[in-house]
Amino acid sequence: MTLKSLFFLLLGLIITVLLDQAIKYWITHTMLLGTEIPLFPFISLYHVRNSGIAFSFFSSFSHWGLIALTITIIVFLFWLWKNTELDKALSRFGIVLIIGGAIGNLIDRIRFQAVTDYILFYIDGVFSFAIFNLADTFITLGAISILIDEFCIWIKTKRHLDKSK
């Protein structure tokens, strides 16, 4: 692990966690639970608390069980980041996004025994997506970054193998 990569890890974590927590602070201090502020015909701010993980999975787990699970995942992700080759920059960036999102949601879980969610996508009377937050978005974008990186490596390897035939 180089000093430069450690710097970018810490910078990425600081940015993701601060952005997530700043928005959640604003939501919790300006909106009552259960209130909605329509922004566009398809998106609203809708203040809720989620006692589970993504899409309310594991909501039957105990509060401390979810905290322990989240910490375990964060520790594993730090190990994964440390052991991912430096040339896999997109994967390493994705792992940082996932860790930052997990830490942001962990802070909520410790403070409120639930995660503050507030983004609602919907088509009036037709479709409503699960309510989520910026930390969830970071986690999703991080996973997509890793998948894209792995897919590009697979394509590159496949082309190399095809040329060697």
From Swiss-Prot:
* Pfam family membership, one: Peptidase_A8
Which UniProt keywords are listed? Answer: Aspartyl protease, Cell inner membrane, Cell membrane, Hydrolase, Membrane, Protease, Transmembrane, Transmembrane helix
Intracellular or extracellular location(s): Cell inner membrane
Assigned EC number: 3.4.23.36
The organism's superkingdom is given as Bacteria
- Give the enzyme class: hydrolase
Q: In which pathway does it act?
A: Protein modification; lipoprotein biosynthesis (signal peptide cleavage)
The membrane-spanning stretches of this chain are: 7-27, 28-48, 61-81, 87-107, 128-148
Q: Catalyses which reaction?
A: Release of signal peptides from bacterial membrane prolipoproteins. Hydrolyzes -Xaa-Yaa-Zaa-|-(S,diacylglyceryl)Cys-, in which Xaa is hydrophobic (preferably Leu), and Yaa (Ala or Ser) and Zaa (Gly or Ala) have small, neutral side chains
Q: According to its record, how does it sit in the membrane?
A: Multi-pass membrane protein
Quote the catalytic residue positions. D117, D136
**InterPro entries tied to this protein:** Peptidase_A8
GO cellular component terms, alphabetically, are: plasma membrane
Q: Per its record, what are the GO molecular function terms?
A: aspartic-type endopeptidase activity
What GO biological process terms does the UniProt entry carry, in alphabetical order?
Answer: proteolysis
Principal cellular location given in the protein's record: membrane
Q: Which family does it belong to?
A: Belongs to the peptidase A8 family.
State its role: This protein specifically catalyzes the removal of signal peptides from prolipoproteins.
Protein name from the UniProt record: Lipoprotein signal peptidase
Q: Which organism is it from?
A: Bartonella bacilliformis (strain ATCC 35685 / KC583 / Herrer 020/F12,63)
